[in-house]
Amino acid sequence: MTGCCDDGPATGPRDLRERLRVVAVRGESLVVAADRASACAACAEAKGCGTRALMSMHRTDLMTIARPAGLIVAPGDEVEVAMSGNNLLAGAGLAYLLPALAFVVALALASGAGLSDGGAALVGGVVLMFSFLPLVLLEAARGCRGRCRCSTCIRGTADDGRRAAFRTGLALAAGLVLAGGVRVLTAPAPDVSETFYVFGTLLEVETHGVPEAQARDAMAVLGAHFRQMHRDWHAWAPGELESLNAAMAAGQSFEVDPGLAKLLQQGRDLACRSEGLFDPAVGGMVEAWGFHADTPPEAIRSDAVVAKLLAGAPKMTDLTITGTTVRSSNPAVQLDLGAYAKGAALDLAEADLTAAGIRDAVLNAGGGVQVLGDHGSRPWRVAIRDPFEWGVVGAVSLRPGEALHTSGNYERYFDRGGIRFSHIIDPRTARPMRGVVSVSVLSDNGALSDAAATALCVAGEEDWPRIAAQMGVRAVLRITDDGSIFATPEMRARLEAVEGGFPAPITVVDLPKDVAIPLCPEG
């Protein structure tokens, strides 16, 4: 195997190896998914390290490494990556030991020179600051990540202890942080875990209590289905949905896969129930604002552009779905399934795992978590991110089959003049939604939770309880841009305080009991 560092081949007993999934191939570089060991999170929980530590430990990040000449690899493959244990120890020393040692020595020398306590503290602070310079220089030279190398695609299993140590090293190197709206808190070491790259995000699946061969077979099925979803449901990449959008813009009907037809019908029904606040037909508005691209936009759209978007008036009820044939009466309709595709993907993944005989698993897609069964004697415990601070609002223990999805303005956005413009577009104004920072929805269906979270971000203060009731969701947490927190009685009863309490008082809002469910016109 090719050496990973400056000190020779990666074959010694101190070398750490890990099997990582390739999410992209960029010339002579590979983008791989690297996560911190679940065992670390379990240890942190047991020792009371705190929720923030747990959440920063248990997540996945992307890392770029060099691709050896001649290595043939494609997204979805797995590669063996090695890191020298010596380099890991050196990085830990630079990060933790050198600053502490430099500070203590500086204080001792300053005191010996007769400086006052204030002067000694000042000298120690300056020395402490400069003691981080070697670590900064190391990172500028790509740090530990630049010392990782891979040589071959594999399908084997690495030694558990060295896998855990390697993940810890990658976490140190990559500076992992909290991402997404929800995060699994209770995380014992999984029997089998896989990370997939779907819809521009990392989707983690962990199974428990089944033989590894059975779990690996199930993961292979999931991987194939996720790749198909990513290809067929992407609005701005070659695939079935892009072809459908082109056909509708030309006034033509289009034959789609039965799975996509079912998803579009579900989206149409949810759009009607939300009174159009959730509407996948506004992909043209998303594209006009630039949120379809990988990089965030930089400019506010003019009133003329917005007026043109509104004049098109695209909506899901413009669609007619007959079996697997789809057509639109409005050429302005451009479908973007991003507001509920992750939830729908988790629903399908849950069905795949159940069909494979797997009873206990957790699926984590950044802003959404869905669970099967539990992880022993305890339910899966999930944190809801505080959109204002580094921490969480609270935690929810999920029951088997439940899904918790969060949407908000804190992930994809740009700022102009102190105003945040998010990727969630209000179909009524053709502009990014305002006034709400995040909404979390708990239900027994991933697509419903995902879509409702988007709709309730857009809904106004007076309308959101009615919209929630119409969409059939009862457990909702809503945070506005002034920091106010609102929860339905069902969500308030499930929400658990962490880290000493909630970040703000929670106002309980009752949902109306008798609401008329809007019906979609036939089509």
Curated annotation (Swiss-Prot):
Flavin transferase that catalyzes the transfer of the FMN moiety of FAD and its covalent binding to the hydroxyl group of a threonine residue in a target flavoprotein. Is likely involved in the modification of RnfG and RnfD. Required for nitrogen fixation. Mg(2+) binds at residues 339, 450, 454. It is a multi-pass membrane protein. GO terms for cellular component: plasma membrane. Its cofactor is Mg(2+). InterPro entries: ApbE, ApbE-like_sf. In the N-terminal section; belongs to the RseC family. In the C-terminal section; belongs to the ApbE family. It is found in: Cell membrane. It catalyses: L-threonyl-[protein] + FAD = FMN-L-threonyl-[protein] + AMP + H(+). Pfam families: ApbE, RseC_MucC. This is FAD:protein FMN transferase. FAD binds at residues 277-279, 336, 342, 423-425. It comes from Rhodobacter capsulatus (Rhodopseudomonas capsulata). GO terms for molecular function: metal ion binding; transferase activity. Its main location: membrane. Keywords: Cell membrane, FAD, Flavoprotein, Magnesium, Membrane, Metal-binding, Nitrogen fixation, Transferase, Transmembrane, Transmembrane helix.
